[in-house]
Swiss-Prot record:
Descriptive protein name: MOB kinase activator-like 4
Matches recorded under SUPFAM superfamilies: Mob1/phocein
Record-linked InterPro entries: MOB_kinase_act_fam (IPR005301), MOB_kinase_act_sf (IPR036703)
Gene name linked to the record: Mob4
Similarity section: Belongs to the MOB1/phocein family.
Protein species of origin: Drosophila melanogaster
UniProt region (Disordered), positions on chain: 1-21
Amino acid sequence: MKMADGSTILRRNRPGTKSKDFCRWPDEPLEEMDSTLAVQQYIQQLIKRDPSNVELILTMPEAQDEGVWKYEHLRQFCMELNGLAVRLQKECSPSTCTQMTATDQWIFLCAAHKTPKECPAIDYTRHTLDGAACLLNSNKYFPSRVSIKESSVTKLGSVCRRVYRIFSHAYFHHRRIFDEFEAETYLCHRFTHFVTKYNLMSKENLIVPINVGENAAPGESEA
């Protein structure tokens, strides 16, 4: 992208850039982004502009491949969820949260093991985000950031279900941390709208009360 005087905009932070000036380059239309990472950059651009404008962030541009759009959003959610995981470490430990739970109705089993089993909540969080990163960066299932096979797109739903449990645990057991993080990022709000819009999760599993009032049924949930 070039400025009016013909000079090229360097879209990266130069050495010595102050934190308040990070990523403060002009917005660029998606169609002018010449990169295989264009969709990711476009989504991050919208988030940086106004994280509360969930509807705009989730509005898919014309002619955009829907599979790639969903994939890139889920990658972005997982990257941002690491920020919540870091904050949770302040009070969520194997001794304080021995199981991954939300309400008393559910105990979530961790899929990172050969046979899904119970994990302390903070370990479940780490395992889930690590597993999601491994899958979403897999050359076997997602060799391209430009087009994605439908058989690979179908794997996104299971990732959504697992990472959503991080939101639900934080909401029901670490409400102050959840509220502070959500006030800054609107991440759970955006995620809830995303999975609802693209039917990636059933509404009865969306137990954090963001435009969803249903509760989960009693039981034990496997990965």
